[in-house]
């Protein structure tokens, strides 16, 4: 009988091979259960290790954001159709915080706050994912705002200038032209985009919060018709969306803008409007049973807007010198700028443009109240030429408003006051602009300089806008070198000023006013009296 031998090495090797190839089918996974779901909020039990703002996955692919982390339950903001959720549904952790895809291919597209396309043009190829709650640049990563962000609107570029990296609030009652001002600013970037110069190009993001779907479609159509959609992305959270989408939409726009800013590009982000975002956040907070404060807003509503708007910056040269300019819109009620949300955002931003319903109804459009509007960046964000010609414009208009109120009750005015009233009325008319018709900075400087120096004083008020439009065309043909000089960043030289005056006087001789009165002051010739005329007798020889 053969002797049985046992090799310990063979046994050890066999066990090692078996254990290395073995894979356990069981795995550990945290699972929660839906307790209730209503009004866009789900209460979930379980998930003891969940993080704040972590994404949670519900059945049917619906996702939510963990907000309230209580000891026995979690308050979740549902991003999607909450009506399909029911009690007892399983909830899983994803281990991820909310982020959106970003990239160059998002230009020209309409997306929702999750970065998903909603324009029916197919999927978008993303470069990377970017977290929505991204930290704003630190103090050392910034530099002062000094580059102008031209809006194409004379009243803003001259008196409340906006710089790249600035946060300028657009505030006013409903239907006063707030969105129109921002859309004109986007349209005015077309020439810079077509130049192909990265230092001039501005990528635009329009964030629509709580707007009607038809309004968002109209904005998209306007941008497309004017050739501005190719450098613009629309982030849409219409009124039909849940409060969660309206709350996150501005952060999605900021995340996309920061992606381009950190690449060294210039970005313009328009938040239309933050009042509706605050109302959506208030609704979420009340449904989550957080303690209400003033006007039922939660205590951190100031932080909601400050952490969003602080992400706008002009980066230092070491960081690539990119910029992100923010134009938040706030809607007031009865021109009350002292309400809770308006005062919050005014204190966060670097200035405000106040649009007044009374001016709008009087036909002054854009209806900018220059007395209340201010830019804390000021002349640092203006070209040299604009800074020089617009220096006295605000004072002239303020003096005109005071004198206009006084003249209502005064019967007689001296010649100087009457002249100031006449010029003020022409300046107000000059600052009016049609919608979707932004003007280049060269046109603005020439028009404001000529009007401020009295060259529009003889033009009837009702003809000012037509006179300006036709005059600019004439000056382009007569003195093109002046526009080239201004476009290069220089001030108006004495030679250029003389050339402008001469060309303007030539144009006045051919301009036809509505009532037929001449617009050039020809020297008056007094008629001779009868005794001054020497009578000669003419004799005719037959």
Curated annotation (Swiss-Prot):
Superkingdom, taxonomy of origin: Bacteria
Chief place where the protein resides: membrane
Localization in the cell: Cell membrane
InterPro entries noted in UniProt: ATP_synth_asu-like_sf, ATP_synth_asu_C, ATP_synth_asu_C_sf, ATP_synth_F1_a_nt-bd_dom, ATP_synth_F1_asu, ATPase_a/bsu_AS, ATPase_F1/V1/A1_a/bsu_N, ATPase_F1/V1/A1_a/bsu_N_sf
Record membrane topology: Peripheral membrane protein
GO MF annotation list: ADP binding; ATP binding; proton-transporting ATP synthase activity, rotational mechanism
Pfam families linked to this entry: ATP-synt_ab, ATP-synt_ab_C, ATP-synt_ab_N
Feature type site, description Required for activity: 373
Keyword Transmembrane helix: no
PROSITE patterns: ATPASE_ALPHA_BETA (PS00152)
Catalytic activity: ATP + H2O + 4 H(+)(in) = ADP + phosphate + 5 H(+)(out)
GO cellular component: plasma membrane; proton-transporting ATP synthase complex
Entry annotated with the keyword Transport: yes
Keyword list, A-Z: ATP synthesis, ATP-binding, Cell membrane, CF(1), Hydrogen ion transport, Ion transport, Membrane, Nucleotide-binding, Translocase, Transport
EC number(s) per entry: 7.1.2.2
Membrane-crossing residue ranges in chain numbering: none
UniProt: ATP binding residues: 172-179
Quaternary structure (record): F-type ATPases have 2 components, CF(1) - the catalytic core - and CF(0) - the membrane proton channel. CF(1) has five subunits: alpha(3), beta(3), gamma(1), delta(1), epsilon(1). CF(0) has three main subunits: a(1), b(2) and c(9-12). The alpha and beta chains form an alternating ring which encloses part of the gamma chain. CF(1) is attached to CF(0) by a central stalk formed by the gamma and epsilon chains, while a peripheral stalk is formed by the delta and b chains.
Function: Produces ATP from ADP in the presence of a proton gradient across the membrane. The alpha chain is a regulatory subunit.
Name assigned to this protein: ATP synthase subunit alpha
Species of provenance: Corynebacterium diphtheriae (strain ATCC 700971 / NCTC 13129 / Biotype gravis)
Biological classification of the source: Bacteria, Bacillati, Actinomycetota, Actinomycetes, Mycobacteriales
């Amino acid at each position: 009988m053969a002797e049985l031998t046992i090799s310990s090495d063979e046994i050890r090797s066999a066990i090692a091979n078996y254990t290395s190839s073995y894979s356990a089918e069981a795995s550990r996974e945290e699972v929660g259960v839906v307790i209730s779901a209503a009004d866009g909020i789900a209460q979930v039990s379980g998930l003891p290790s969940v993080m704040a703002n972590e994404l949670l996955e519900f059945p049917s692919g619906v996702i939510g954001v963990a907000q309230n982390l209580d000891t026995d339950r979690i308050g979740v903001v549902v991003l999607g159709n909450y009506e399909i959720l029911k009690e007892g549904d399983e909830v899983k952790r994803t281990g991820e915080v909310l982020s959106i895809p970003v990239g160059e291919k998002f230009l020209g597209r309409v997306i929702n706050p999750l970065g998903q396309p909603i324009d029916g043009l197919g999927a978008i190829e993303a470069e990377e994912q970017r977290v929505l709650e991204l930290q704003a640049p630190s103090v050392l990563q910034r530099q002062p705002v000094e580059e102008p962000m031209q809006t194409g609107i004379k009243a803003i570029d001259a008196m409340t200038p906006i710089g790249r990296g600035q946060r300028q609030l657009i505030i006013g009652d409903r239907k006063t032209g707030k969105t129109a001002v921002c859309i004109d600013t986007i349209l005015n970037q077309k020439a810079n985009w077509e130049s192909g110069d990265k230092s001039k190009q501005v990528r635009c993001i329009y964030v629509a919060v709580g707007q009607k779907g038809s309004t968002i479609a109209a904005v998209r159509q306007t941008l497309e018709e004017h050739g501005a959609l190719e450098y613009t992305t629309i982030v849409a959270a219409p009124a039909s969306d849940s409060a969660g989408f309206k709350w996150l939409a501005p952060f999605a726009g900021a995340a996309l803008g920061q992606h381009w800013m950190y690449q060294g590009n210039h970005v313009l982000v328009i938040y239309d409007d933050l009042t509706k975002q605050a109302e959506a956040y208030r609704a979420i907070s009340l449904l989550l049973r957080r303690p209400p404060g003033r006007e039922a807003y939660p205590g951190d509503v100031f932080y909601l807007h400050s952490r969003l708007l602080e992400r706008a910056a002009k980066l230092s040269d070491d960081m690539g010198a990119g910029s992100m300019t923010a134009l938040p819109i706030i809607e007031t009620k009865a021109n009350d700028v002292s309400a809770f949300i308006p005062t919050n955002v005014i204190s966060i931003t670097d200035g405000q443009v106040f649009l007044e319903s009374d001016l709008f109804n009087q036909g002054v459009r854009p209806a900018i109240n220059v007395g209340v509007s201010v830019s804390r960046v000021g002349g640092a964000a203006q070209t040299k030429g604009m800074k020089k010609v617009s220096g006295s414009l605000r004072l002239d208009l303020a003096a005109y408003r005071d004198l206009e109120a006084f003249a209502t009750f005064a019967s007689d005015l001296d010649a100087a006051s009457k002249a100031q009233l006449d010029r003020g009325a022409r300046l107000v008319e000059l600052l009016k602009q049609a919608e979707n018709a932004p003007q280049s900075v060269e046109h603005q400087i020439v028009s404001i300089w000529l009007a401020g120096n009295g060259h529009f004083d003889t033009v009837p008020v009702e003809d000012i806008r037509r006179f300006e439009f036709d005059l600019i065309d004439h000056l382009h043909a007569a003195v093109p070198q002046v526009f080239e000089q201004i476009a290069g960043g220089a001030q108006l030289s004495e030679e250029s000023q003389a050339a402008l005056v001469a060309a303007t006087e030539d144009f006045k001789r051919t301009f036809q006013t509505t009532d037929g009165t001449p617009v050039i002051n020809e020297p008056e010739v007094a008629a001779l009296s009868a005794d001054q005329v020497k009578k000669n007798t003419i004799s005719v020889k037959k």
